[in-house]
């Protein structure tokens, strides 16, 4: 058989093949004997009880060790067995050989020569074994903690246990590249925990080591780490210098006499845009759109600029927003604060009778917002129309005219209730935003500002982060008319629309109804808007703006952070939506079928007016758009990222 031998192993005489180098001859078959079919057969007649009876006493092994220490020489196996046991034979030799293979420390077997370990080695090995016993005991205790699923104190764990805890944390975060050790896997089985992220998150929550609302995608990102002490110190330095004269301040147009207003959500603290109305000497109504100017303090390629570029945007979470710049700047000198002089970029627009742009311009300025309004306050003023708010009412009328103009250019206006989950005091709460007149006013003003800046970029061949959208083939007017207005019709349109794209050259934006568009009104929250302002500044000062290639390089860098922020924000909203449904798992809601997502799996999209949400749900066969359904929770587990909804007729 070449380098292998066929042998019969154990009392059961199981046939196996092993390399000859792994085999050691203990006793030769006596002359004239027939090879036995089992080790229990003659001439060996060995079994467990026989071997146990033949094994010398522990003190005999100890005495042999002392003698061999004095001799200082190794012995062949047969001589060593006779020294230990006082005799030799198949049974005692096999018993002693098996003892050598066990956990004993006194001797070592080197190619059939038995050596007594030196005393120093023996003491070291015994010390190591004692230490290992203690470590094993601590490890067993740690694995016992897992089975108990009770809160633990990580600082009391042994290093090996802490390493395993860190490994479990990594798995819970979705990073399961490093395999779980066998002992840990067995401990998880005892703890009734599958070796998968969701189950491990449940276990870690029980152990008090995992925030049930921690986002795996947020872990170890720039937002998770916050701003470094160096960046915070730089922010404090800029905060202290904000009131001092800066380059270009003398060239700013003073617009503080205009009655400007900012309109935002009640809890918004970083105000990056405002509105004003001016009646020119020619009697023309001029719209002013003021935009915060963080570039006055933040130099290109400075540490804060590089960090903002890395983030790409602010991060919007249910528990609160994480800003692109340190908070003391975004809510301080960057923000358009009411009653204070603020540096800004101001975009002015005069509309023609149809709502098109008749004249426009962009100017660095000083502005002083007269007051701040919430959307609710602004809606009330627009509805009540008090004479002292004539400017606000005129702005509303002008921007409604502009909105109708865009609609005539093919813009898709799809206003509807929008629900999202916010966290209040640790609880998931549903917040529904209604498309009121003030929200439409602000949105239209921001789109108008983006159109004006994009037009300026087009006329001067300026590289900007233009936003565009390819033309789409929409359902026919007859098909849309057959659908009820609102979410059902909107879903049919949205299905046809392409993704928004960013490029350094202008192109039409289909759903906005514009030939060119750029986002330019949130430089505190979007790095791309800050890039726009820097290009405008270079142009206004007669300097060369960034080339298309240089702009594209910056866009690519910031979009890494933007994509990450979008993914984190979506995961966050999905998680808190699951938490909300856990709190309302017995509820049911009227729903309207919108369209099929995966008909083969009976997965469709439904709209729940009461929640202001479009949700994926299991739907009955043959559902048609606008069909009324009732939505219920089938399964929800926020730690496992699971939500299954079922809609029934």
What are these regions (language model features)?
Residues 122-146:
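Short, amphipathic alpha-helical interaction segments positioned at domain boundaries
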Residues 3-5, 23-25, 46-105, 112-113, ...:
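Electropositive polyanion-binding surfaces
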Residues 151-253, 257:
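Low-complexity, highly charged intrinsically disordered N-terminal segments
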Residues 35-58, 138-169:
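Basic, amphipathic alpha-helix used for nucleic-acid engagement in HTH/winged-helix/SANT-Myb modules
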Residues 2-52, 109:
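Long, low-complexity, charged/polar intrinsically disordered regions in eukaryotic proteins
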Residues 2-13, 20, 30-31, 173-221, ...:
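Short, charged N-terminal helix-start/capping segments
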Residues 97-98, 102-130, 214:
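Charged low-complexity interaction tracts in eukaryotic proteins
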């Amino acid at each position: 058989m070449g380098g292998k031998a066929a042998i019969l192993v154990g009392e059961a005489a199981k046939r196996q093949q092993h390399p000859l180098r792994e085999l050691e001859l203990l006793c030769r078959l006596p002359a004239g004997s027939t090879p036995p079919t089992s080790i229990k057969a003659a001439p060996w007649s060995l079994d467990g009880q026989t071997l146990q009876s033949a094994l010398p006493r522990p003190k005999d092994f100890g005495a042999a060790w002392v003698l061999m220490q004095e001799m200082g020489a190794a012995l062949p196996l047969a001589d060593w067995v006779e020294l230990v046991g006082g005799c030799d034979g198949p049974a005692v030799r096999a018993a002693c050989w098996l003892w050598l293979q066990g956990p004993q420390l006194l001797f070592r077997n080197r190619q059939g020569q038995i050596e007594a370990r030196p005393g120093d080695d023996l003491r070291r090995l015994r010390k190591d074994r004692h230490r290992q016993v203690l470590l094993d005991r601590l490890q067993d205790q740690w694995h016992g903690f897992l089975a108990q699923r009770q809160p633990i104190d990580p600082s009391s764990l042994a290093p090996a246990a802490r390493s395993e805890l860190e490994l479990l944390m990594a798995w819970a975060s979705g990073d399961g590249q490093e395999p779980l050790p066998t002992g840990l896997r067995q401990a998880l089985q005892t703890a009734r925990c599958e070796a998968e992220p969701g189950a491990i998150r449940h276990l870690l929550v029980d152990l008090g080591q995992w925030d049930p609302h921690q986002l795996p995608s947020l872990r170890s990102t720039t937002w998770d780490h916050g701003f470094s002490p160096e960046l915070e110190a730089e922010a404090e330095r800029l905060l202290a210098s904000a009131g001092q004269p800066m380059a270009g301040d003398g060239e700013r147009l003073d617009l503080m006499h205009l009655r400007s207003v900012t309109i935002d959500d009640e809890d918004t603290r970083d105000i990056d845009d405002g509105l004003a109305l001016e009646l020119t000497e020619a009697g023309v109504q001029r719209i002013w759109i003021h935009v915060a100017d963080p570039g006055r303090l933040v130099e290109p390629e400075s540490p804060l600029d590089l960090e903002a570029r890395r983030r790409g945007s602010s991060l919007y979470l249910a528990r609160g927003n994480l800003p692109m710049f340190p908070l003391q700047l975004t809510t301080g000198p960057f923000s358009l604060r009411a009653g204070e002089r603020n540096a800004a970029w101001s975009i002015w627009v005069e509309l023609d009778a149809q709502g098109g742009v008749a004249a426009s311009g962009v100017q660095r300025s000083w502005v002083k917002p007269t007051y701040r309004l919430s959307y609710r306050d602004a809606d009330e003023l627009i509805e009540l129309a008090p004479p002292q708010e004539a400017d606000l009412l005129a702005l509303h009328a002008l921007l409604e005219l502009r909105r109708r103009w865009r609609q005539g250019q093919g813009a898709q206006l799809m206003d509807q209730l929008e629900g999202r989950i916010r966290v209040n005091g640790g609880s998931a709460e549903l917040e529904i935003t209604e498309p009121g007149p003030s929200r439409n006013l602000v949105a239209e003003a921001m789109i108008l500002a983006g159109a004006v800046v994009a037009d300026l970029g087009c006329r001067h061949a300026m590289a900007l982060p233009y936003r565009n959208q390819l033309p789409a083939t929409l359902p026919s007017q007859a098909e849309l008319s057959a659908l009820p207005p609102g979410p059902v019709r909107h879903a049919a349109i949205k299905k046809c629309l392409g993704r928004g794209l960013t490029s350094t050259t202008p192109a039409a934006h289909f759903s906005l109804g514009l030939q060119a568009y750029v986002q330019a009104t949130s430089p505190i929250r979007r790095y791309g808007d800050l890039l726009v302002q820097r290009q405008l500044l270079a142009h206004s000062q007669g300097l060369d703006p960034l080339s298309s290639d240089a702009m594209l390089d910056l866009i690519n860098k910031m979009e890494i952070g933007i994509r990450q922020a979008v993914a984190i924000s979506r995961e966050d909203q999905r998680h808190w939506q699951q938490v909300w449904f856990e709190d309302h798992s017995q509820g049911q809601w009227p729903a309207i079928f919108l369209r099929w997502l995966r008909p083969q799996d009976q997965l469709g999209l439904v709209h729940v007016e009461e929640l202001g949400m479009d949700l994926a749900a299991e739907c009955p066969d043959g559902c048609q758009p606008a069909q009324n359904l009732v939505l219920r929770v089938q399964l929800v587990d926020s730690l496992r990222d699971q939500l299954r909804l079922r809609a029934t007729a």
